[in-house]
Curated annotation (Swiss-Prot):
Keywords: Guanine-nucleotide releasing factor. This is Ras-GEF domain-containing family member 1C. Residues 1-35, 443-466 are annotated as: Disordered. GO terms for molecular function: guanyl-nucleotide exchange factor activity. Residues 200-446 form the Ras-GEF domain. The keyword Aminoacyl-tRNA synthetase does not apply. Guanine nucleotide exchange factor (GEF). One of its GO terms (biological process) is small GTPase-mediated signal transduction. Residues 34-164 form the N-terminal Ras-GEF domain. The keyword Aminoacyl-tRNA synthetase does not apply. InterPro entries: Ras-like_GEF, Ras-like_Gua-exchang_fac_N, Ras_G-nucl-exch_fac_CS, Ras_GEF_dom_sf, RASGEF_cat_dom, RASGEF_cat_dom_sf. PROSITE patterns: RASGEF, RASGEF_CAT, RASGEF_NTER.
Length: 466
């Protein structure tokens, strides 16, 4: 099986090998495309560039980039069918007598391609018809080498295990428990607070990192493309990907939940001294997240503390030592397109590349900004050029961004999970937005006329009071 790909493996456009010598209609695939790096080409040429021969194997950079971006133009199952058809046609695998020496050289490269494809994009092989294409072409070369059958069996076994693991999506991690929303403050006798479950900021930062990496593990690279897919003007129908970005959506929901959990924990206590204590606790948790490299939890905590129901608690904030909070806010300041955060992210990425331990390898980006960057890359450049060619240069940049993310999400979490803490993070009830405002007004009375009118409205709608 292939080793795990790294960002440097995936994207080294200047080192792409020349494509195979077979020609495709209207173009010579044997001609290097921009010194080996295909800036643009027809879809047929790019597919041909993916197909191995006895003497040619595409670079890892090309394989990842094309498999990632091709789904904008062709369904993965159709792409595999075309690759298999080209293999059969070019290697004459439909003939009764095969050139065994040549087929053995080709077969090893074909199995390598299939191994890389199933390892990096396992969800492309969820349909039985896709597996059928794979087993058909391998079945044709198996008589030339008795090891091919066992190697394919192992490949499929690994694939099925990976699909089964991915099928246990993030939602299953919390079992049957579903978070509920508070509308009003519950009696203190029945409410559990986070500080009662975990009072050490570093421990909570570790457990948040555990949750983040577990959720990231389920996001496939293809979801970044499928989230923004538009109908290809040269394709007959739009690929149906609406059900294939669930993990991205679930991860964004987790970020929002953490924001609301932070705000809920702050607004819940009746006394401002306790509220100030909770704020200072979360500031310390956020600082530990920053030190670990967990920027997503860091941003969620800061966002939760900046929600209006929390930020308006002036008497509470007056009791808080805010110096550390302002430093963290500065790091995540959106000014200059988050330039401070991007500098910190580059520092964490460099630390990860030179790491001597799993602890130093952790890089969890602010996910919503990553999605935004990919969205603007997609919107800012056309998928096809005016001549109909695929804009492969755009997809090299896309692969660079996604490939880096894939490297980060594959890091093993070095922190031991504490089920009681992660269970609380997933299932603790949180206030709705209106509930947060009502709790905030009950903690510190409304000051402006607008706040007084809103408080009156919330008391009427939620509590049934006037």
């Amino acid at each position: 099986m292939p080793r795990t790909l790294t960002a440097s493996d995936m994207v080294t456009p200047g080192s792409l090998s020349p494509p195979p010598t077979e020609s495709t209609e209207g173009e010579q695939a044997g001609q290097p495309l921009l010194d080996g790096a295909p800036s643009s080409a027809s879809l047929d040429t790019l597919i041909q560039h993916l197909v191995p021969t006895a003497d040619y194997y595409p670079e890892k950079a090309y394989i990842f980039t094309f498999l990632l971006s091709s789904r904008l133009f062709i369904e993965p199952r159709e792409l595999l069918a075309r690759v298999c058809h080209l293999c059969i046609e070019q290697q004459q695998l439909d003939k009764p007598v095969l050139d065994k020496a040549r087929v053995r050289k080709f077969g090893a490269k074909l199995l390598q391609l299939l191994a890389e494809w199933t390892e990096t994009f396992p969800r492309d092989f969820e349909e039985e018809s896709t597996i059928g294409h794979l087993t058909d072409v391998v079945g044709r070369i198996s008589p030339c080498d008795e090891t091919y059958g066992s190697r394919v069996h192992q490949l499929l076994q690994t694939l099925h295990q990976k699909l089964a693991s991915l099928g246990q999506g993030p939602e299953s991690l919390v079992g049957a428990d579903k978070p509920i929303s508070y509308r009003t403050k519950p009696p203190a006798s029945i409410h559990r607070e986070l500080l009662g479950v975990c009072s050490d900021p570093y421990t909570l930062a570790q457990q948040l990192t555990h949750v983040e990496l577990e959720r990231l593990r389920h996001i496939g690279p293809e979801e970044f493309v499928q989230a923004f897919v538009n109908k290809d003007p040269l394709a007959g129908t739009k690929p149906r990907f609406s059900d294939k970005t669930n993990n991205v959506e679930a991860y964004v929901k987790w970020f929002n939940r953490l924001c609301y959990l932070v705000a809920t924990e702050i607004c819940m206590p009746a006394k401002k001294k306790q509220r100030a204590q909770v704020i200072e606790f979360f500031i310390d948790v956020a600082r530990e997240c920053f030190n670990i490299g967990n920027f997503n939890s860091l941003m969620a905590i800061i966002s939760g503390m900046n929600m209006s129901p929390v930020s308006r608690l002036k008497k509470t904030w007056a009791k808080v030592k805010t110096a550390k909070f302002f430093i963290l806010e500065h790091q995540m300041d959106p000014t200059g397109n988050f330039c401070n955060y991007r500098t910190a992210l580059r520092g964490a990425a460099h630390r990860s590349l030179t790491a001597h331990s799993s602890r130093e390898k952790i890089v969890i980006p602010f996910f919503s900004l990553l999605i935004k960057d990919i969205y603007f890359l997609n919107e800012g450049c056309a998928n096809r050029l005016p001549n109909g060619h695929v804009n492969f240069e755009k997809f090299l940049e896309l692969a660079k961004q996604v490939g880096e993310f894939i490297t980060w999400k594959q890091v093993e979490c070095p922190f031991e999970q504490d089920p009681s803490i992660t269970h609380y993070l997933y299932t603790a009830p949180i206030f709705s937005e209106d509930g947060l405002y009502l709790a905030s007004y009950e903690s510190e009375s409304p000051e402006s006329q607008t706040e007084k009118e809103r408080w009156k409205s919330l008391r009427s709608s939620i509590l049934g009071k006037t």
